[in-house]
């Protein structure tokens, strides 16, 4: 699967916008972001790999329960939060190669 930076950004927004520290986000609650659940799971796994989220992530089940963003997740989201910055960042990425690591995206933004 290919990494979808827009989906990653949208998942981070969804986690940030969850209203309660006691309520975790599940795959079902994220399903409005994309109809392909396998793609959603894959991107949650990537966010977990990057250390941007805290939760129960079981790739074998598969099961997810995202409790919150990490400090690093907040920092990344703050860097790409503004829509005009995000649009410019994606434009720059398109000129370079079309894809990049999350750290490179943060640096460009």
Task: Label the predicted regions.
Residues 65-93:
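Short, amphipathic alpha-helical interaction segments positioned at domain boundaries
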Residues 2-31:
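Short amphipathic alpha-helical interface segments
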Residues 39-51:
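Basic amphipathic alpha-helical segments that dock to polyanions
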Residues 85-109:
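Membrane-inserting effector segments that mediate pore formation, membrane fusion
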Residues 48-60:
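A short, conserved structural fragment
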Residues 15-18, 47, 77-80:
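Generic structural signal for hydrophobic core residues of well-folded globular domains
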């Amino acid at each position: 699967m290919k990494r979808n930076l827009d989906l990653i950004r949208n998942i981070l927004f969804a986690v940030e916008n969850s209203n309660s520290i006691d309520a975790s986000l599940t795959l079902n609650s994220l399903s409005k972001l994309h109809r392909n659940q396998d793609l959603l799971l894959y991107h949650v796994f990537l966010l977990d790999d990057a250390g941007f989220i805290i939760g129960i992530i079981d790739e074998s089940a598969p099961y997810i329960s995202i409790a919150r963003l990490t400090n690093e997740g907040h920092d990344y989201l703050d860097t790409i939060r503004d829509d005009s910055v995000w649009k410019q960042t994606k434009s720059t990425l398109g000129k370079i190669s079309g894809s990049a690591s999350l750290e490179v995206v943060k640096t460009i933004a």
